[in-house]
């Protein structure tokens, strides 16, 4: 049973989340031969002030 957690900075629309979930699920089915009915996808939005790249917060 695959469990995929998508962490992302800033908001995504419901439509974007639906498309990402569909694509990730299809990829797991095609590449790893995991049934879509057992593939879970969750989304965690991280605020820009709580995410850093190259030592700098994204809200800078």
Where on the chain are the PLM-derived regions?
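A domain-level signal for the structural core that forms small-molecule/cofactor-binding pockets
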Residues: 2-60
């Amino acid at each position: 049973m695959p469990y995929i957690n998508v962490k992302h900075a800033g908001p995504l629309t419901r439509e974007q989340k639906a498309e990402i979930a569909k694509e990730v699920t299809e990829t797991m089915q095609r590449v790893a031969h995991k049934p879509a009915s057992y593939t879970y996808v969750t989304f965690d939005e991280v605020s820009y002030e709580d995410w850093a790249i190259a030592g700098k917060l994204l809200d800078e």
